[in-house]
Amino acid sequence: MSQLVEIRPGTDADVIPLCEFLNACTLVHQGVSRSSAADIVARLHREGADPQLDSFVAVADGAIVGFAHLWAHGPDEVKLFARTHPEARGRGIGSRLLSLCDRRAAELLPRAQRTTTTWTADASAPALLEFQGYRPIRYFVTMEIGAGSVSEQATVWPAGIERVRLSRRPDLAGALYAAWKEAFAGHWGRQVESEAEFWTERRDAKIGSAFPFEPELWLLALAPGEVVGFCLCELSVSDAESVGRVAEIGVVPARRGAGLGFALVHDAFRELRGRGATRIVLDVDVENTTSALRLYQSAGMIPRPAFTIWEKRPSPHVLH
């Protein structure tokens, strides 16, 4: 492979090769490859981002060997995504991509912190990020259960709770958003999103993705007059396997401690298994203060290291 590496903005002509590139990266560190062309389009054309300024493609010998892009996440954070092909490590590509992202982030939001995510299995990432001034701030694990381990027992709901699907009750969309805000208030890393942002991120940006938006899999716990809990599920179907994912689960504070969280998890498992999932996963912050880890383990899930979130603060002179 040539030592000459060109870095240029991403374009729509890169969609298919970028898809193949990212699948090669995730296959090494996760054992799966499920990026789709729609995922790449969503990355390049994320709302508010300019591919000519906010994406970087590293090319050597006509092949993509690195990719990075960044976007504003609220007024105080810029998120970065950067990957180097497993066979192109050790050539400084990752450092160049991160430097370009940092420079662009400083132009975009000079006072904002920068965050990025790395897979725990990527042993080379920590040294690179620390050299670039990043520090680890949060660790996540992926909880997993095989479909064969899901309990056959019917879900037992707390008194007065009815489970409904968003697809059957679209009129509850606003109530779901209100419950989501209440359930995640104060949680680390949660930005207060407007209702429009909530739906853009979870519905519109999912069109054509490996884990598409399916309102039939959005399960709501309904008490008289309000949504008090929710479990937003997704299903990825491929030739290799079908993976169910609990993307978000929450219970409003006033309803915690009564078994509603366990009922939602159990019901989601049964629902995803019934849709053909061979295994079910969800990601959880190891510092979660709502006893989430214990809840998922009590439901039969097994934890394994997943990813780390890194942060870089702007230079002090920028703040003055």
Describe the function of each predicted region.
Residues 10, 84, 249-251:
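Hydrophobic adenine-recognition pocket in adenosine-nucleotide-binding enzymes
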Residues 90-104, 248-251, 257-274, 279, ...:
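Conserved acetyl-CoA-binding loop-helix of GNAT-fold acetyltransferases
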Residues 176, 221, 268:
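Conserved hydrophobic/aromatic pocket- or pore-lining residues that grip, position, or stack substrates
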Residues 22-119, 223, 228-242:
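Conserved donor-binding loop and adjoining core beta-sheet/short helix segment
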Residues 183-242, 246-249, 253, 262:
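Phosphate-binding active sites in nucleotide-utilizing proteins
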Residues 131-151, 217, 266, 275-320:
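Active-site/acyl-donor-binding loops of N-acyltransferases
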Residues 72-79, 84-162, 167-168, 308-312:
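Acyl-donor-binding surface of acyltransferase catalytic domains
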Residues 1-43, 155-197:
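Short amphipathic alpha-helix that is part of the acyltransferase structural core
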